[in-house]
Amino acid sequence: MRWNTVLFDLDGTVTDPKEGITCAVAYALRQQGIIADPDTLTSFIGPPLHESFPELFGLTEEQTDRAVEDFRVYFSRQGWAENIPYKGMAELLESLQGAGLKLVIATSKPEEFALRIMEHFGLAAYFHRICGAQREDLSLIHI
């Protein structure tokens, strides 16, 4: 059987999200007077923010809600642009597309940010669809 579609995640597959996520977390924590060791902030990559802030820094529910909001403020301003495409990704995508495959992004990142990131790095044109979380879903996932 020949496959005709290749499904990609965004963070950790197409782009390295470390800089944008860790800087956004550091910003959110600073808003609450917490200065964190940068090495601990990589633990925020992957799990939902609403779990990571209380687990790693002991934030209350109210503090966590505020930290998540501050994270989103930073991320929407500049954190999204701090993603870095992995070396060779454009060439890989071009090759797959040239082989007649449909390429799709499926991410828990809000779709507006996924689109912005892919367009910023000139990668959006390789994809048939870029699918992410919708705005109303944001309380359930991390960015």
Predicted regions mapped to residue ranges:
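N-terminal helical cap/lid subdomain that shapes the substrate entry/recognition surface
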Residues: 2-90, 99, 112
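Conserved hydrophobic residues forming the short capping helix/wall of the S-adenosyl-L-methionine
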Residues: 29, 118, 122
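Glycine-/small-residue-rich active-site loops that bind phosphorylated ligands and cofactors
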Residues: 13, 110, 136-138
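Substrate-recognition element of Asp-dependent hydrolases with the DxDx(T/V) motif
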Residues: 25, 89-118, 131-133
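Conserved H-loop
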Residues: 35, 123-128
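Conserved small/polar residues in nucleotide/adenosyl-binding loops
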Residues: 141-143
